[in-house]
Design a protein with these regions (language model features):
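Non-transmembrane "mature" sequence context
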Residues: 1-168
Length: 168
């Protein structure tokens, strides 16, 4: 009875999720607007999807991915982040490095530095850039920019220049 099992599993996930969100909201001592709670949850869900698809690496994992043999591989990732060749998003108390920005050789894709420059020039945060990269867009006929990072980096940068400069 796979359908019944699926429904039982879904019910369990819903209850667990509601309990966890309730506990988190209870920990906040001020009133939280529902729109804020929804936005935080949407961001959390997006990063979970990015993690499931590409990985969300800790600084140590990113450093190892880049080939560090140091006893502190996180330093290599931190240095690359400071040099603006990697993007990172805050996940709790640490920075997470989305796995999509690494090439097959483990090194940061050169396009990432160019995209960080575009984002910075348009006052976009790294989180905003990551979110834009992972969202479908009409600029790519419904594809996500992230799906073109390795195959058409110049086009991704050109589209970013146009899309990130839009003022609302």
């Amino acid at each position: 009875m796979p359908v019944v099992d699926d429904l039982i599993a879904a019910n369990s996930r819903i209850r667990e999720s509601a309990r966890a969100v309730g506990e988190a909201l209870s920990a906040v001592e001020v009133y939280t607007e529902p729109a804020i709670a929804r936005a935080v949850q949407a961001e959390h869900n997006l990063y979970a999807r990015i993690g499931a698809e590409f990985g969300m690496l800790s600084a140590a994992e990113a450093g190892k991915q880049m080939g560090s043999r140091s006893s502190a591989p996180r330093n290599l990732a931190a240095a690359a982040h400071r040099a603006k060749t990697l993007v990172a998003v805050r996940r709790g108390s640490y920075l997470a490095y989305p796995g999509f920005q690494f090439g097959p050789d483990g090194q940061p894709l050169p396009v990432i530095a160019r995209l960080r420059d575009v984002a910075e020039a348009n006052d976009w945060s790294e989180a905003g850039l990551v979110q834009w990269l992972c969202a479908p867009t009409t600029y790519f006929d419904g594809d996500r920019p992230v799906d073109h990072l390795a195959t058409d980096p110049d086009r991704v940068v050109a589209v970013a220049n146009e899309a990130l400069a839009v003022s609302w």
